Amino acid sequence: GRFWHTREPSVVWFFKNHWFNIIGIIRDHGIFYYCNIASPYVIDDEALKYIDYDLDIKVFPDYSYKVLDRNEYNLHKKKMEYPEKLREILEVELDKLRGMVENRVGPFAEGEVMRQYERFKENVLNQ
């Protein structure tokens, strides 16, 4: 596994029933999101784990977005022989994620990243 970190405060959502995770990144000029198409997470004695399937969505403060790494995904799906069912799941989940961005629901709801960040500061940092 690899480690990834941001320089800015961030809030991360992992899902048991969705094939993506969402990182809300708090910057001076707005909230950015980096979304990974990935397996649902599992937790074991070592860490929280998931498989990253290369496809990503970067969402800007105005909620415009860009799908990233399509070429890398296409290369890996051939090289690693992703089964048809897996490819279908990943495309469906990518569409669900786009819908969440476009409809501004879940982590993309107005103010949600800051609400969760403030909640973290109150409940964890003030102990």
Predicted regions and their residues:
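Juxtamembrane/interface motifs at transmembrane-helix termini
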Residues: 43, 86-88, 108-109
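Short loop/turn motifs at secondary-structure junctions and domain boundaries
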Residues: 47-51
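Intrinsically disordered, low-complexity N-terminal regions enriched in serine/proline/glycine
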Residues: 2, 13-14, 32-33, 64, ...
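A hydrophobic, small-residue-rich beta->alpha segment in the mid-to-C-terminal subdomain
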Residues: 53-99
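A generic structural signal for short coil/turn motifs at secondary-structure boundaries
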Residues: 44-45, 77
